[in-house]
Amino acid sequence: MLNFTVGPVMASDEVRAIGAEQVPYFRTAEFSAIMKENEQLMKQFAKASDDARTVFITGSGTASMEAVVMNVFTPADKVLVVNGGSFGHRFVQLCEIHEIPHTEIKLEMGTPLTAEDLKPYEGQGYTGFLINLHETSTGVLYDIQMISDFCHRNHIFLAVDSISSFLADPFNMKELGVNVMITGSQKALACPPGISVIILDTEAIKRVEANNVKSMYFDLKDALKNGERGQTPFTPAVGTLLQIHARLKEIERNGGVESENQRMKMLAEDFRSKIKDLPFTIVSKSMSNAVTPLHPQNASAYDIFLKLKDEYGIWVCPNGGDMAEKVFRVGHLGNLSPEDNTTLVDALKDMQAKGLL
């Protein structure tokens, strides 16, 4: 099975081999050393400040999205939330659940956030900004420099979900003034699902320490304290953390985050050039290297997903809700090659020849 979804993705042989090993006991000096290296490499690849901290949460990306909303914002805040799709809507829901005062900036599907969209909120006393850097459901990559400039001018705390864009697109946490970054194990880290990662700068750490969170599992004060000794407050997904360590070391050996950015850019451009004569419309006006969102001109997007899965042994990423029949997505994350792109494109051409596209 060839996997072009946006998570889980194709893992390297080294990472998969660790998944076959016996999971070790983790309250040891050896595991603590691995976790401390995980923290440092995550900070290095996110280009975070030396005094930033990394927290590993056993849970999906949504677990860390919720932990961030709970720990860095309070009812005294006034937060702007960009909603350009399913995951922007999730931040809106989290603010509603935790009673964080917020204003939703609602975007049409596939459209980027613009300076004009932000203009009405200049100087209006907002204290927080929540953004999915790459709205994975629609394939839109937002202009993080523009958002950073807006937050800097208005003295706004900036929390960024980089779950699908981390390692795929250029990102410099320190230079952009991002206070919190979130990512997950199953995207470009190319490991099994189960771990989400939060990187916090000193301002975010101050907010966490001052906030009285009504949660045991999601209180980041405990996670930060335990992280000082390379541990977690509760039993983590030990095997996945060991796989993350192998993957981070793999990235380091292969030239670091810039090489990963370039590799995924090459894969995305290669795929997009190979499908230019097929009956698809790319629906995003501002794309990430992580994924290509496609609208079939003559067929159901979900039917294409099923045909590729059942008849060709290829997974692409379907959409849900209103977009299920309209858009499917092709990911460029993980252990893929231009030859894999050709295999997918040949399958699509075969479907076209059979009148299925």
Q: Model features per residue range: what roles?
A:
Residues 1, 322, 326-357:
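PLP-dependent enzyme catalytic core of the Aspartate aminotransferase-like
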Residues 51-80, 84, 88-92:
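Conserved beta-loop-alpha segment that forms the PLP phosphate-binding cup at the N-terminus of a helix
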Residues 10-11, 186-270:
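Active-site C-terminal subdomain of aminotransferase-like
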Residues 280-311:
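Conserved PLP-binding catalytic core of the aspartate aminotransferase-like
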Residues 174-186:
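Conserved active-site segment immediately N-terminal to the catalytic lysine
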Residues 1-58:
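A glycine-/small-polar-enriched, mobile loop at the entrance of the PLP active site in fold-type I
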Residues 112-167:
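Active-site phosphate-binding strand-loop segment of PLP-dependent enzymes
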